[in-house]
Regions:
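Short beta-strand element of the conserved SAM-dependent methyltransferase core
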Residues: 17, 96-97
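A short acidic, glycine/proline-enriched capping/turn motif at secondary-structure boundaries
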Residues: 56-58, 99-102
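A structural motif
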Residues: 89, 93-95
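N-terminal amphipathic, basic helical "cap/leader" segment at the start of enzyme domains
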Residues: 1-89
Length: 137
């Protein structure tokens, strides 16, 4: 897929419409390589990505269910189950986070957060260019 075609044709795909197979190890590696090429003032690389799949999705579902219980004690069991199932809608989740460095740098926190967003966008674009759907949630 040509670069401009990939950029202009990418759309978010709801987790409800994502299915297997998940990207292979080589496809993931290519996508993470694209993420590493993101604009990054100061070359701090503040982004961190956590890949969740397999049993990890079930454990994450339990975390979602517990969060729903704590947010709404006495919630209908269907609400709790719906929260649990959100983690199981796709074969792979990638959690993106910014680890903001505050000491020893003049780079403002907001620029580090923006760099993480850029890396995440590169990741989404790379998966799209390889034929996969994805959504930032």
């Amino acid at each position: 897929m040509e670069a401009l075609q990939a950029l202009t044709s990418r759309e978010s795909v709801s987790p409800r419409h994502l299915g297997g197979p998940a990207p292979s190890a080589a496809e993931r590696e290519a996508a993470f390589k694209a993420a590493m090429a993101a604009p990054d003032h100061g070359a701090l690389r503040p982004w961190r990505f956590l890949v969740v799949e397999g049993e990890g999705l079930h454990r994450l579902g339990e975390v979602f269910a517990e969060a729903a219980r704590r947010a709404n004690p006495g919630a209908d069991p269907a609400v709790i189950e719906s929260a649990r199932e959100k983690a199981l809608r796709s074969p792979l989740l990638i959690v993106a986070a910014a680890v903001v460095k505050r000491e020893g740098t003049k780079i403002p926190a907001i620029e580090q957060i923006i760099a993480t967003g850029c890396a995440t966008q590169n990741l989404l674009n790379a998966f799209h260019a390889q034929g996969y759907g994805a959504m930032l949630v």
